[in-house]
Every structure is written in C-alpha cells, then in structure tokens.
C-alpha cells in the first residue's frame, strides 16, 4: 500500500476528506520525528492534541484519523500489535 492509497483508505474509514487526512498525517509525521516514543496509540489523546494544534483542526477529527491509521497499521503489520501500537 503506497502513501496515496493509505490516505485514501484513511479518508474512507474515517469519513473525512482526503485533504484533511493528508494534513493530519503530515503533522503526525513531523510530531513523530521529534517524539518518537510518544507517537503511538498508547498516547493517542496527546498525539491528537499536538496534531490538532499543528493543523488547526478539531482534536476529535485528528483522533479519529489517527485511530484509523493505527488500526490500518495493526492490520497490515502483524508485529505492530505486539510492539505497543495497538
């Protein structure tokens, strides 16, 4: 699954626009670069809040998209469930 397919799948699952998903994932990538150990499902509320501030979107929208992202990762990468991603 390439980047565009991932974004389109997140849009489908979350019910949000493709552009919104793209913005959230771009902000999440930047957040993860600086907070690698925090950028996981265990810290979903904190991550969503940081992404919301960066994108000026509502935190609930960011949390929804990030939840769908973590679910997608768990489905596609079998060891992800054992590493604290879910």
Where are these regions (language model features)?
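Mobile acidic interaction elements
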Residues: 1-86
